[in-house]
């Protein structure tokens, strides 16, 4: 892949996606693996993803192995980093491990609305706010199920892939003060260069103040999950759901 980057200027780090998915399935977010992009000494001009359409439907069959919960965790790991340009794959509408193509797999139909999830949008907005900031990625001394991604002295993203909550008390580059989690709304305090608190199992925390923009939640308009998109009569009654 390094040769492609040198020749073309950038490339997709597909094998890194495999690493990310493996970390999610095992609950092991070892920083040594998640900072190894598989590109040798090449510039990190890479496109990263949790999964692609090939992974979803191909031999990897991620539709049956990687849950939406996993995707949220993996996407936060990708989006919070300085390295790479993350690409989000929108699965088919209402897809599941038992229904690979979902219930409304038609041309022109929107895919799954996971990309509007509050944790996903928080990670995306964090990425924009942290543009240009250096990164410091580490695991706490007693767990590789939790990863901390600091961006300069402005922000911190925390991901817990464990099935148990994790209490932390770690040193941080963030200035002393209070920081609001842009996912839950909870407040965390940095004092004397340390931050402490609890991150729930299988969850994320996004902390920053500088650069935060107050935006309305992403609106969702969708048909009821009972509607399949196929019918053999002259008409069909459809129920719509609106969320904001």
Question: What do these predicted ranges mean?
Answer:
Residues 1-213:
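Active-site-proximal helices and loops of the catalytic beta/alpha 8
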Residues 236-243:
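Aromatic/hydrophobic beta-strand junction motif of beta-rich domains
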Residues 215-225:
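Proline-enriched interdomain boundary motifs that mark the N-terminal boundary
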Residues 225-234:
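Short, solvent-exposed loop/linker segments at the N-terminal edge
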């Amino acid at each position: 892949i390094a040769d492609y980057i040198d020749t073309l200027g950038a490339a997709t780090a597909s094998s890194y996606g495999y690493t990310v998915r493996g970390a999610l399935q095992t609950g092991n977010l070892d920083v040594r693996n998640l900072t190894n992009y598989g590109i040798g000494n090449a510039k990190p001009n890479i496109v990263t993803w949790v999964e692609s359409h090939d992974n979803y439907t191909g031999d990897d069959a991620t539709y049956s192995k990687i849950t939406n919960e996993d995707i949220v965790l993996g996407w936060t790991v990708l989006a919070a980093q300085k390295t790479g340009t993350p690409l989000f794959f929108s699965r088919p509408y209402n897809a599941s491990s038992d229904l690979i193509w979902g219930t409304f797999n038609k041309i022109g139909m929107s895919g799954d609305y996971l990309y509007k999830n509050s944790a996903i949008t928080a990670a995306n907005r964090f990425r924009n706010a942290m543009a240009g900031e250096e990164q410091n990625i580490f695991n706490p001394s007693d767990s590789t199920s939790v990863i901390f991604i600091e961006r300069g002295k402005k922000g911190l993203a925390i991901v817990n892939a464990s099935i148990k909550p994790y209490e932390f008390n770690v040193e941080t580059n963030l200035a002393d003060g209070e920081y609001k989690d842009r996912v839950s709304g909870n407040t965390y305090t940095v004092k004397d260069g340390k931050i402490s608190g609890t991150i729930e199992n299988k969850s994320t925390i996004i902390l920053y103040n500088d650069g935060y923009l107050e935006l309305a939640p992403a609106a969702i308009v969708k048909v009821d999950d009972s509607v399949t998109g196929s019918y053999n009569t002259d008409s069909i009654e459809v129920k719509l759901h609106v969320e904001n």
